[in-house]
Regions:
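Feature marks extracellular polysaccharide-active and adherence modules
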Residues: 129, 160, 173, 187-189, ...
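Short glycine/acidic-rich loop motifs that flank beta-strands on beta-rich extracellular proteins
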Residues: 167-170, 200-209, 224-233, 249-255, ...
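Right-handed parallel beta-helix/beta-spiral solenoid domain characteristic of secreted/periplasmic
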Residues: 177-229, 282
Length: 584
């Protein structure tokens, strides 16, 4: 049947969707410093005004842009609870998207409370212990939850030994910062005989660390809830030193942004993850749990140095980026080892299992992999994962089940890979010393595109696996021989069910690979990874100040001030009374 268009029913207009109006403070609610900066976000444009408890204006009609963190004012806090009142008024004409309006343009009124409290002074140490709720002295330690709220720049949180059975996330809120000269330390008790363990009992995310200039050292994080990370590092200029993350419900230690509204300038940057180990992390679906990750929302200057990642459900390292959030900052991984990923410790066949996965969505990253070893991973050893411009220096990739080295992209028109000193090798044996003929027939995946200078990939210092000759060959036809290595027997590291064996650490935290994959004088200079002790970065021995002596010193200061004021008032009354008598 043919219908004349003039007889059609009138076109229906697309319904207008309403977006619920949201506005809230996202600055810290507890602090150990009196100087305070407000942070506020809303999902629409508008203006914000703030008043203190005595109705003194702190901020008046400060412009707020939608989905942007605004810093409307600073103030000086009083000891104890500080209450503030605010009014946010949405712009009446604000349209969030086409065919969409805000659910309400009426002013939003609310209150916001910040607690200011101090324990001790700069240079002193606050002690925490399992199940304790004291005042932070060594004899009467406090909870880890209170310590991370009220610690001051230049102080140390000393984590006493034992297992901390925790039921909520340990969160260092944004704004709880040290400084470059006065960092905040959170370190294991150097007098203890065992490492402290934060066990989250499968109930929640582990630690979310959004402060700047912190130094974390010497503790373990385990058993976060399914799909929740062990540690999320979201601040800047922090160091994670000798931290172990294992058996968490998602990635062991991940660098990524704190809030979904954070733009690139707020993404975590210039953090050092030093001599840390991450293993056995697995989500229920075996899809997301990596050992380490710096992905999706990562700023510049983040470095992994001296880390070990093994037997994680997904990848050893994941530097994934995607088009929706854009490129991430360049990440450096050096002096590190990835093995056995994609299999759990009991041999369970889990997720993807790449050793070092260095990109995503064909986004530029310029990530650097230097002096690293990847072996016996379920999938690829070194994987660009479509990133078109990674740099690999002096690294060894051995006996990975898929490609030892994969440099490829998908949608990028040009690549700019740089590779120097690569040894890709296959022993022909798996961890059970059974011939692995399939592995010998897995070539590299090297796919330069467009303007790529192939001399940056194929050169005399790079030895890639050749399936025809069953050996590793450089650009001039020279080959790798077994006498280049002191040992290719890593069976002492892996047992029959792929659990950890004997990768140990030296007393200073550096990796002790021993003779495994170490090169002899038969190998040419400038190739492969070198884990000689002098090439590695040692951990730092923390300086722990004296214990805080009196607990909440802010209350003491307040009482002292009242005492002095009272004394002055009494003295004034006495003087007045004396003068009155003299006059009489």
């Amino acid at each position: 049947t043919t219908i004349n268009p003039s007889d059609d029913a009138p076109a229906e207009e697309k319904p207008i969707e309403e977006l619920v109006t949201n506005a809230a403070f996202n600055s810290k609610t507890a602090t150990g410093t009196s100087d305070y900066e407000f942070r506020f976000t809303a999902n629409c444009d508008g203006v914000l005004s703030i008043w203190d408890s005595e109705d003194n204006a702190i901020a008046t009609d400060v412009a707020v842009a939608a989905n942007t963190v605004v810093k409307p004012a600073t103030t000086t806090l009083n000891v104890g609870k500080n209450s503030f009142r605010y009014v946010f008024t949405p712009d009446a004409g604000y349209i969030p998207e086409k065919d969409m309006v805000m659910s309400s343009y009426e002013p939003i009124e609310g209150t916001f409370t910040v607690t200011y409290r101090t324990y001790g002074v700069e240079g002193q140490s606050i002690y925490v212990a399992p199940g304790k709720y004291g005042v932070g002295t060594k004899e009467d330690p406090m909870s880890i939850y209170d310590a991370v709220k009220y610690v001051q720049p230049g102080q140390t949180i000393v984590v006493m030994e034992g297992t901390y059975y925790l039921d909520k996330t340990v969160k260092v809120e944004r704004g709880v910062n040290g400084t470059a000269d006065k960092p905040i330390q959170m370190v294991a008790d150097t007098d203890a005989s065992s490492r402290p363990v934060f066990d989250f009992q499968g109930l929640c995310a582990g630690m979310v660390l959004a402060g700047d200039y912190w130094y974390f050292q010497g503790f373990d994080v385990t058993n976060s809830a399914n799909a929740q990370k062990g540690i999320q590092l979201s601040g800047k200029y922090n160091t994670m030193d000798n931290i172990m993350t294992y058996h968490n419900g998602n990635t062991g230690l991940q660098v990524s942004r704190y809030l979904t509204t954070d733009e690139f300038d707020m993404w975590p940057a210039y953090n050092l993850i030093l001599n840390c180990t991450s293993y056995g992390n697995a989500d229920a679906g075996y899809e997301d749990a990596d050992g380490f990750a710096a992905k999706l929302t990562v700023g510049d200057g983040n470095v992994f140095d001296g880390c070990i990642s093994y037997n994680n459900a997904d990848d050893g390292w994941d530097l994934f980026a995607k088009v929706q959030s854009g490129s991430i900052g360049a990440v450096t991984i050096k002096n590190s080892v990835a093995y056995g990923n994609g299999y759990l410790e009991d041999g369970t066949d889990a997720g993807n299992g790449n050793g070092f996965k260095l990109g995503g969505d064909s986004m530029s990253g310029k990530h650097v992999l230097e002096n690293c070893v990847a072996f016996d991973n379920k999938a690829k050893g070194i994987d660009s994962n479509s990133c078109p411009d990674i740099k690999i220096k002096n690294s060894t990739s051995i006996d990975n089940e898929s490609y030892n080295v994969a440099l490829y992209t998908k949608t990028a028109e040009n690549t700019d890979y740089e590779a120097t000193g690569i040894i890709s090798y296959r022993t022909g044996f798996d961890s059970d010393t059974v011939a692995r003929t399939a592995g010998l027939n897995v070539k590299e995946d090297l796919e330069p595109k467009g303007t790529q200078d192939i001399k940056k990939i194929y050169k005399t210092t790079n030895y890639f696996w050749d399936t025809a000759s069953k050996t590793s060959v450089n650009s001039e036809g020279a080959t790798v021989s077994t006498d280049w290595f002191k040992s290719l027997d890593y069976s002492a590291i892996l047992d029959g069910v792929k659990s950890v064996g004997t990768i140990t650490r030296n007393a200073d935290g550096t990796i002790a690979l021993g003779d495994v994959f170490a090169l002899t004088d038969k190998a040419p200079a400038g190739v492969g990874a070198d884990f000689s002790h002098d090439k590695l970065t040692a951990s730092v021995s923390p300086v722990i100040g004296e214990s805080v002596a009196t607990g909440d010193t802010s209350n003491i200061a307040f009482l002292l001030a009242l005492f002095l004021m009272s004394g002055a008032a009494i003295a004034a009354v006495c003087i007045y009374d004396r003068k009155r008598r003299i006059v009489k």
